[in-house]
Amino acid sequence: MTEVKITEGDLHPRDARFAIVASRFNEFVVNALIKGSLDCLDRHGVDKNAIEIIKVPGAYEIPLAVSKLARTKRVDGIIAVGAVIRGATSHFDYISGECARGLSEIQSQE
């Protein structure tokens, strides 16, 4: 049986800079997501001095902040975290949908 070739990206970035864009709304959930993101970056060898956290009011504002930050090219990777909790209104669908759409658009831009 022949071996299958496996190709992976470098999971231990050296000299890379990262930003975490996080919403302030629902901070009790978002703070745990930030902590998990920081832990993941640490486990992959990212220097703590190479990480910045940018807070925005809510999930709706995340795509705009990510877009502006990406255009500066001062970071190599951006992690976006926010929490929208489903309630009795359509607010959840609207906000989470717009956030996902905005991030998808940014991701497809060069």
Q: Where are the model-predicted features located?
A:
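Glycine-rich phosphate/diphosphate-binding loop of Rossmann-like nucleotide-binding domains
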Residues: 8-57
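Short alpha-helical scaffold segments that flank and stabilize functional sites
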Residues: 39-40, 68-69, 110
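Glycine-rich phosphate-binding loop
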Residues: 61, 65-103, 107
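Short coil/turn connectors at secondary-structure junctions
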Residues: 15-16, 48-49, 73-76, 109-110
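Short gly/ser/thr-rich secondary-structure transition/capping motifs
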Residues: 1-5
